[in-house]
Amino acid sequence: MGKFLATLILFFQFCPLILGDYSPSCCTLTIGVSSYHSKPCNPAQPVCSWTLDLLALSADQALQPPCPNLVSYSSYHATYSLYLFPHWIKKPNRNGGGYYSASYSDPCSLKCPYLGCQSWTCPYTGAVSSPYWKFQQDVNFTQEVSRLNINLHFSKCGFPFSLLVDAPGYDPIWFLNTEPSQLPPTAPPLLPHSNLDHILEPSIPWKSKLLTLVQLTLQSTNYTCIVCIDRASLSTWHVLYSPNVSVPSSSSTPLLYPSLALPAPHLTLPFNWTHCFDPQIQAIVSSPCHNSLILPPFSLSPVPTLGSRSRRAVPVAVWLVSALAMGAGVAGGITGSMSLASGKSLLHEVDKDISQLTQAIVKNHKNLLKIAQYAAQNRRGLDLLFWEQGGLCKALQEQCCFLNITNSHVSILQERPPLENRVLTGWGLNWDLGLSQWAREALQTGITLVALLLLVILAGPCILRQLRHLPSRVRYPHYSLINPESSL
């Protein structure tokens, strides 16, 4: 009896710890080698929420696809709508019918290989009637281009489901598994809502290693650069490995396929190598060879210098430019006035020559008319002499000739206005105003000078300020810390 009571007391003492350690506090979504924790959820708080990026999910699934020869859809397009297909571990009986809605289809069972499908048909084994998920109660999601928000009821956590994009001819499928789990005691490194401890924490905390590398980088640049870390998925991370350490020939499981792997035979780290990299398959494997280090892409950028407070303009430069502009305007006005005066005199001389030519042509025309009258008079006299033979033309047995002189062109030439009135010598406006020629030209010159002065006052300070800040706007090149062509 005493042993039973002691056992019962120990059970009640450790029961809260056991229940607290294994009671689920969230739902973990797994795709490829990456996992994403939902916001805290449990039977009392049954809504489990995720905020995901479809491009990152595609990169994670490419590391460990659910089916061989998967035809992936790399460039996600905004015009393609997203659909959700729940899956079940045990395929239910098919009795026909099933739940159907615009953003949700009937549950299907995963079947390889993918063949490509559209959203309104079940892509694998066809629709089933029971069990099914209700779209609003069990699962719902919102989509903004490649950003996805999923809300899943806690009772459905533990079942896999897939996301489908309506793109005929492709299989843009993301196959996701869910299981109840506990939130990690500390925040995951770098990637939010992702449990990467099984890859990044083989020995000492991985975050301290990254901080040590950042500190060494800052010291090497004498704290003149900024270290920028790219918060991306594991598929875009880099690996430094030592080719001097051999990899065991025993079979091992690939854990990560990095986007860049660089050999570093002469690199000395402040700590030991943490992972095992196999150069033959270009992947991080599970063997404990410790010849590599995983790190995210990070780059160096120069520290921007603080510039002095910019003034509106330099007064000396403004007045200097204004004086130069005014001098140029005065010189241009005087030159223009002189050219206008010389042009006026030239037009006057040309007009005099034209009038003299016109008078000469008119006199010649009048003389020609008199000659024509004399010829007509002689013709009439000869016709009277040869009246008996039938006239002069019949007596000569020739065709009669007549003189036709027109006066229209000479009339048009006399009616032409003076050349000075037909040629524009100013701005093409009526600047008469009852003033003399020099007064009109002086008025035009003054208006030109005022317009130039206003233009310099308005645009001069802006142009000078832009010229002063032009050297400080030269961009510095972006240097990557990991350069494939550099010798580490």
Curated annotation (Swiss-Prot):
InterPro entries: TLV/ENV_coat_polyprotein (IPR018154). Residues 21-442 are extracellular. Residues 376-392 are annotated as: Immunosuppression. CDD domains: HTLV-1-like_HR1-HR2 (cd09851). The surface protein (SU) attaches the virus to the host cell by binding to its receptor. This interaction triggers the refolding of the transmembrane protein (TM) and is thought to activate its fusogenic potential by unmasking its fusion peptide. Fusion occurs at the host cell plasma membrane. The transmembrane protein (TM) acts as a class I viral fusion protein. Under the current model, the protein has at least 3 conformational states: pre-fusion native state, pre-hairpin intermediate state, and post-fusion hairpin state. During viral and target cell membrane fusion, the coiled coil regions (heptad repeats) assume a trimer-of-hairpins structure, positioning the fusion peptide in close proximity to the C-terminal region of the ectodomain. The formation of this structure appears to drive apposition and subsequent fusion of viral and target cell membranes. Keywords: Cleavage on pair of basic residues, Coiled coil, Disulfide bond, Fusion of virus membrane with host cell membrane, Fusion of virus membrane with host membrane, Glycoprotein, Host cell membrane, Host membrane, Host-virus interaction, Lipoprotein, Membrane, Palmitate, Signal, Transmembrane, Transmembrane helix, Viral attachment to host cell, Viral envelope protein, Viral penetration into host cytoplasm, Virion, Virus entry into host cell. Disulfide bonds join C225-C228, C225-C401, C393-C400. Specific enzymatic cleavages in vivo yield mature proteins. Envelope glycoproteins are synthesized as an inactive precursor that is N-glycosylated and processed likely by host cell furin or by a furin-like protease in the Golgi to yield the mature SU and TM proteins. The cleavage site between SU and TM requires the minimal sequence [KR]-X-[KR]-R. Changing G329A: 25% loss of transmembrane protein cell-cell fusion activity. The keyword Ligase does not apply. Residues 1-20 form the signal peptide. The chain crosses the membrane at residues 443-463. This is Envelope glycoprotein gp62. A motif (CXXC) lies at residues 225-228. Residues 464-488 are cytoplasmic. The record marks R312, A313 as: Cleavage.
